[in-house]
């Protein structure tokens, strides 16, 4: 074994019928973790159920119930390799209710592939004021996914037929929007693709093909390989937000999540915030292999001693008891940008916050100041209200214990989305946190250390 390739997490985003799952499934089918026999079985099942065109998307539908409904819900983790990287795909679904999933999923991604449907009418629907293309791109940026690739998909559609004009029109429109969001458009490759036929996904299209005649850029895999390697904050203290907690027969309690900063290893004493519970880590596993240490970007399960499943919850944060352990917060100050709220927001507003894997109602207890969203300059102290388009510094108080951090110290734990009325009404970045001291319980194994 040579040096292990670096892991890169991808989130695939885009409007509901852009072809995300088909493109993703095709990638995994060709380059990754699914054996050919399983695919043949899927093909047969899909055909029998009259969903032949969902063949590759089917690859991503692990659950029987999901299959019959024809939509992908679970944020599934799937792997494939290129010459340079080991990619893990977090399949983020595109239906409106799943934006919450997307927020917690996206905070794990190093790179976003934004899949857009090129056919006339479909592209416009995705980018319209209430289309998901816009919202997904904005969320990805705010949640710290700084690298993006746009796949101009469904180029094989009979109304597009690999048209250079349509590709240029769609690319130009996307550039305008991506610039507004904060991306630098020349740095975002726009790759014409067909998730269904596989054209320009894995290799460049030859000159005899309608696309090859005018397109000389990279295929999707080449664009992925050309991404910058993510910088991993290994030297920071451990922060690992829990995504789930399992009880596994014969093993015990196994919290699961992604290491955001620092490292976790067997024998370490860890503290969970906001409860303050401390215990010893027995073992750490990734993809069913025991590890001596896991670092930033690794999705792991770890076994903890003498802890009941009831003591841990999704949204809790695990850290090193001896090195800046995480704590719950009494309140925090955040810079918030209001995206789409129909009315005025006053002090006392209490929407749901999605921060890392936590999902908790928080009150805007004080509107501290209103600012210019581009320059950050102060416009007004203690505004009476804020509305769509405004940026403000706000003091927030959570309705129940939660653990967050300042964005400058621990970026993945310092950004959040504000949800209300089933949509994302605002996004924010945490500037400072007032920590809460708690007397946490310590298990016997932790006390010995």
From Swiss-Prot:
InterPro entries: EFTu-like_2 (IPR004161), G_TR_CS (IPR031157), GTP-eEF1A_C (IPR054696), P-loop_NTPase (IPR027417), T_Tr_GTP-bd_dom (IPR000795), TRAFAC_GTPase_members (IPR050100), Transl_B-barrel_sf (IPR009000), Transl_elong_EF1A/Init_IF2_C (IPR009001)
Keywords: Cytoplasm, Elongation factor, GTP-binding, Methylation, Nucleotide-binding, Protein biosynthesis
Subcellular location, record wording: Cytoplasm
Residues covered by region (G2): 70-74
Residues with N6-methyllysine modification: 265
CDD domains registered for this protein in UniProt: EF1_alpha (cd01883), EF1_alpha_II (cd03693), EF1_alpha_III (cd03705)
Annotated region described as G3, given as residue ranges: 91-94
Modified residues (N6,N6,N6-trimethyllysine): 79, 187, 310, 400
Family the entry assigns: Belongs to the TRAFAC class translation factor GTPase superfamily. Classic translation factor GTPase family. EF-Tu/EF-1A subfamily.
Protein name: Elongation factor 1-alpha C
Organism from which the protein derives: Porphyra purpurea (Red seaweed)
Gene name per UniProt: TEF-C
